[in-house]
Amino acid sequence: MEEQVANAIEIAGNPSSDQTIKAQAFDYLNQLRADPSGWQVCLSLFTKTPRRSDVVRHVALEIINSATQTGLVDIQGLSFIKDNLLTYLQQMYGPDGAAQSDPSNIQNKIAQTITYLFSALYATEWNTFFDDILRLTYNGPDSGVRDNTLGIIFYLRVINSIHDEIGDVLVSRSRAEQDRANILKDLIRERDVQKLVTSWQDILSQWQERNDLIAEMCLRAIGSWVSWINISLVVNQTMLDLLFRQLARVKDVDLHQGGEKVRDAAIDVFTEIVGKKMKPADKIDMIVYLNLESIVAQLTASPPLHEHRFTSKYDTDLAETVTKLVNITTVDIVKALDSEDADNATKEKAEALLQAFLPHILRYFSDEYDEICSTAIPCVNELLSYLRKVAKRNPAIIPQQSAMLLPILKAIIQKMRYDETSSWGTEDDQMDEMEFQDLRKRLNVLQQIIASTNEQLYMDAVSEVVRATFHNVRQSGGQIDWRDLDLALHEMFLFGELAVRCGGLYTKNKPNNPASERLIEMMLMMVESDIRSFRHPATQLQFMEICVRYSSFFEHHARFIPGVLEGFLQLAHHQMTKVKVRSWYLFHRLVKHLRNYIGNVAQTVIAALGDLLTINAEVPVEGPDGDDMSSEDHEGSADALFNNQLYLFEAIGTICSTSSVPLDKQVVYAQSIMNPIFIDMERNLGAAKSHDERALLQIHHDIMALGTLAKGFSDWIPGTSSPAVPPAPEISEAFGQVAEATLVALESLKFSFSIRTAARAAFSRLIGVRGSHNLPQLPRWIDGLLTQTSSKDEMALFLRLLDQVIFGFKTEIYGILDTLLTPFLQRVFAGISEPTTGTDDEIQLAELKREYLNFLLMILNNDLGTVIISTTNQPIFETVITTIEHFAKDVDDFPTAKMAFLVLSRMSNLWGGPDVVQPSNPANGTTPSQSALPGFTQFMITRFSPLCWALPMNPSFNPKDAQAKQVLGEAAALQKIIYLKTGPEYVRWLRETELPGMGMGPDLVNEYVGSLEMLDIKGFRQFFQAFIQRFSA
């Protein structure tokens, strides 16, 4: 069997193995892994001589580890594995160890196995665990020193592995696993920790100059274990002398890599010591005792960090290691200052330490390497948050804080600057750019803390940077480093978080606050410096972003608008795709904000952007991994370019429809954009009918562009009280061509999902520009948009659009709605009745049900309810009621059931006639209604009332569920409405038929009917919810 297992492992691990045989090998090994006795053959495979291949032995150990972890091995089996592995360790790592040791990956895997055995056996069966492993560190039983290299390295691997298993706080553990880990740590502290610490001291003192790997591993062990053992075991003179000796390596300018790792590991030990949980007073005393400020000062002054700074020899690993120590120490100092448990003496010491550490904080926070700066951000955040807290408590102290805040703020601003090596916008620079922008966001958090602590200090510092930069731009004729200009613009952009936080730059034509006033000054300097002509793409983008963000500035300084518009139109043709595409979006945003201030520039804009309005659809190309390479996720892809090109169409629509442009010119300009698109649609229609993919996509793009142009022309939303006014009849007529062209394409190409999608978007946008002129075409829109192949999602989206139409044109739509309601609802019913084929389909079905019910509510709430019961639509009325009844009983979809009851309540209010019972609380009564629909009162009693019980009587119904309670509340409201409409007739039905039919006795019936009669709707909702809980119990 051993050979069989070994062969399976070899096949599974061989990249050139036949895939079928490889799959069989994996299946076999997985069966072996699950077999309670599978570990036995693996143990033999691992320990047997001659040694098997490394891959066989590695996988064999993995299977053993899996068995020990998952409980497949009993105590006897674990002891058997332990004995065999101890024998193996003695042979391989003991005094008479093999000439050729195991490779590192095998050693780590054995250490892991030994760790799992420790976890299982140390508490009860193997209390000599550490003695047995420590025995490997000697070359013989009589040896007085730990002189066995192989054994020492393996022992330290086990020590570090045990910490990972039971002591590492970053490892996620279940409650049971954490409890077991805590028990093991307690046992170690009780039994063996002293001998372990002594062994580390022995190893470090004997091997620190002889073997860097051993020294580093030993220091890593000390650093990790110190977090959960008694601090005095490490913070004592013997251990500290050993640690200081390793720190002295920092003076060695020719230190090799192994020595550097030892040095860094020694610093990490101090970081772990400081990170240990203690009372504030004890922590501050320990920081003083360790003389950490002096240690950091010496490390900072060392050649790798001082002399070699700003050179290629600068040791960034050492700098980051020291920064971690500075960071954790500063955090604890600040915590002591902020602690209510710390006495005055402790706080005085902490204050002195903070002043001493501030130069170190600034040194590493302002380091030119972003990784080092990032490591210091947590402590700077803690410090600034503390200073803000103190300032809010005692504003008089703010001036005193300036000495500390200003250098930190200057460091933040300087770190916001691109470094000298950055090459913005290149393909290779994308990851660095993302990381730098992330750093900027984190730095801005710190900057905003300072702004909220000392607003004046922040405003002065940023203003000075911006002022000096724009002065240099003017003095040098634009010949300054793009990084400096980008920094000033970036700070201007961020300044808005303070300047416009209360609604905008201006209030009643005056600056909103002092920060707004400063920002307006900066904006004046920016536009007067003519930085739009500065050619670096980063600053060009920043310029546009700022103009859009602070567009209200131009409302009060309209003289600058022509120049800014000219700059945007130039950048719309930028050679770099990133800038060009972004400029299209920002241009759209700018003209939307400044619509009333732009003036009659439509002809100029159309001429300038005309070459960018040519639509050229590209069929997505599938990449080698099957992904769509033209998706929106790829900057510069065909999809992304077109989606941004749409912003140009909307922007042109906005500019052409301003009040400054004569109406006849508006029509001319609109047609100048539309006509080429109509020609293009006609040219591609034949190929599209033949399902040509590119032609279909071209027409999709054409329709989207026309719809977006319409959106730009009109902000008007029918049925709302928005300040926008309906467009002039001439404009509506012009866009009638768009509606007709879209419908012609839709009627020919309704088999295409993308065409339907584009047409639906166009229909939505044409509502605002065409108004009620769209209504006669509604049957054609429905016929094209709701086809046999339309998805539930499409139906739901179109229902939402129809809601918009009904709301906007409630007084004009009745006749059309009466004609199209039956065929339209039949299509919706077909979609609802289709079987679902997966989770996504179920989600779409639920959405369609809710949109259908919302559509009915929209009709009922806008005085169009009679259309449902008109002569034309009478045949479908029963189906409408049946679907609502079905939804009201759906225990798996409470939101839909709730809406179903809302619809039934609204119908009852409208068609149930006037109230025959005066409500106990008129405010909670029903709304005035028309005369009763013949036969509807009986219909409510016999059809609607039983529905209120159908859902709660379902065995799966949980009346305590929050959503279920909401459904019960609506069911109660429906019963109350039926009672108000029918009075004694409903009471008699409940007493004689409905309630007894559910098994209720006279007392329950009396209680129920009495509550229905006496309580208002709100009270009865609460009663019904509680009653169902009692009745279901």
UniProtKB/Swiss-Prot annotation:
From the Swiss-Prot or TrEMBL record, state where the protein is found: Nucleus; Cytoplasm
Classify the source by domain of life: Eukaryota
Listed GO cellular component terms? Answer: cytoplasm; nuclear matrix; nuclear pore
Its primary localisation, in coarse terms, equals nucleus
Q: Which Gene3D superfamilies match?
A: Leucine-rich Repeat Variant
GO MF annotation terms: small GTPase binding; tRNA binding
UniProtKB keywords: Cytoplasm, Nucleus, RNA-binding, Transport, tRNA processing, tRNA-binding
Q: What are the BP-aspect GO terms? A: tRNA processing; tRNA re-export from nucleus
Q: Which InterPro entries does the record associate with it? A: ARM-like, ARM-type_fold, Exportin-1/Importin-b-like, Exportin-T_C, XPOT
Iron-sulfur among keywords = no
Q: Which family does it belong to?
A: Belongs to the exportin family.
Q: What does this protein do?
A: tRNA nucleus export receptor which facilitates tRNA translocation across the nuclear pore complex. Involved in pre-tRNA splicing, probably by affecting the interaction of pre-tRNA with splicing endonuclease.
Q: What is this protein called?
A: Exportin-T
| Native species | Coccidioides immitis (strain RS)
Gene behind this protein: LOS1
